[in-house]
Structure formats: C-alpha cells, structure tokens
From Swiss-Prot:
Oligomer status and interactors: NDH-1 is composed of 13 different subunits. Subunits NuoB, CD, E, F, and G constitute the peripheral sector of the complex.
Protein name: NADH-quinone oxidoreductase subunit B
UniProt-annotated location(s): Cell inner membrane
Bilayer topology annotation: Peripheral membrane protein
GO BP term (any one): aerobic respiration
Family, similarity comment: Belongs to the complex I 20 kDa subunit family.
Gene: nuoB
Cellular component annotations (GO), alphabetically ordered: plasma membrane; respiratory chain complex I
EC number from the UniProt entry: 7.1.1.-
InterPro entries: NADH_UbQ_OxRdtase-like_20kDa, NADH_UQ_OxRdtase_20Kd_su
Length: 224
C-alpha cells in the first residue's frame, strides 16, 4: 500500500491542517437558546447526554512509536487502573478507535503512516501528543524527525515530559474528557463536514500560573 503525506500550502486558506477547516465561532447552542427556549434547552440536554457517553467511553488506538508508549501501557495496569476513566478498551484497528495517542518520536517516514491511520478513524476522534518528542521533536533536532506531530495532525492535548509518567497520561485523559463535555456535534448522521464546535482549552501553565507564582516555600526532593 502506498502512503502519501499531505503537503502544507503556505499560501493556502488553511495552511496548518489542509484536511480540516478551523475558525473561531460562538457556541451554537447559545444562539439556539435565544431563538427558541424550549427546543434550545432540549437540544442542550441531548448534547450533554451524548457527550457524557462519549467522554466516559474513550477507545484508544493501540500503537506506539518509542519509549513513551511504555509509560502509556503502564497506566493500563492494576496499579493505575485507567479503566476508572472508561479508556481501557484498546482497539487494534483505527476504524474502531476514537482516540489516537502519539507516544514517542515521529520520524519523517512514519508521518504519512500516522496521517493515514488518523484519516481511517471515524468521527468523533481526538489526538493526544505524549512526550517531548511528539510535542516538538524533543532532543532530536534533525532532518529525519518531525518537529511536532501538530505539523500534520490537529492535537487536542499535549503531555510534557521525557518520558511522562502514567499519572500525566491519566491527567491528559481527564482534560480531554472535560473538552469532550463542551463539544457540539451534529446529533444525527452527517455526510461531509460535520461542523464540530470545540471550546478553547487554556493551557495548564497559564491556568496554574497564579497558584505557582504564589508559592514561597519549595518542597525538598524527599517530600515530592
């Protein structure tokens, strides 16, 4: 099977993700509530119910690229028990999965394969970039390593670390669940562009900046 990587056109309308069109819009349900209160509230309840089921039944696609995958698999053991978050059903086929975790170093030769696997996943689908190598290439600032998977995939959650601990992966799942709960997707089957609404997620660094800057007494390494 031949794999091809979709090239980015710097002069194009959507130069970052050629396969998707992204724009900043208001929450469509807020507009619906002002038009018809009853139908707006009903649609809001239906979205909440569907999103509740989606965020508590995430099916990850089982594949890994490097050492970060070992930490990801560790979270599936009884010690961490990722089943508490409804994400223990690993799928061997991208057509049965809705979460892709890019765990490890993404080489240039592997990028078209990852992109093809992402295209085979059905909506709704999400992407987690796990580890420094997947986020920005890590220490491999060379021609053969992609400097961040967000160069060719839309990433929902980034996990820092080299490699991140299983607890970091579980926190990323919780952040993804929070984001899924705020999504607005068509409640019926749609062919073509689904017009998905996703709320902006504030980075943890910005969200916890005030709390961290207020700390005056730092813990010793033995207390961490």
């Amino acid at each position: 099977m031949d794999y091809t990587l979709t090239r980015i056109d710097p002069n194009g309308e959507n130069d970052r993700y050629p396969l998707q069109k992204q724009e900043v819009v208001a929450d469509p349900l807020d507009q619906q509530v002002h038009r018809t209160v009853y139908m707006g509230k009903l649609e809001h309840a239906l979205h909440d119910m569907v999103n509740w089921g989606r965020k508590n039944s995430i099916w990850p696609y089982n594949f890994g690229l490097s050492c970060c995958y070992v930490e990801m698999v560790t979270s599936f053991t009884a010690v961490h028990d990722v089943a508490r978050f409804g994400a223990e059903v690993l799928r061997a086929s991208p057509r049965q999965a809705d979460l892709m975790v890019v765990a490890g170093t993404c080489f240039t030769k592997m990028a078209p394969v990852i992109q093809r696997l992402y295209e085979q996943m059905l909506e709704p689908k999400w992407v987690i970039s796990m580890g420094a190598c997947a986020n920005s290439g890590g220490m491999y600032d060379i021609y053969s390593v992609v400097q961040g998977v967000d160069k060719f995939l839309p990433v929902d959650v980034y996990i820092p670390g080299c490699p991140p601990r299983p607890e970091a992966y579980m926190q990323a799942l919780m952040l993804l669940q929070e984001s899924i709960g705020k999504e607005r997707r068509p409640l019926s089957w749609v062919v073509g562009d689904q017009g998905v609404y996703r709320a902006n997620m504030q980075s943890e660094r910005e969200r916890k900046h005030g709390e961290r800057i207020a700390v005056t007494n730092l813990r010793t390494p033995d207390e961490i």
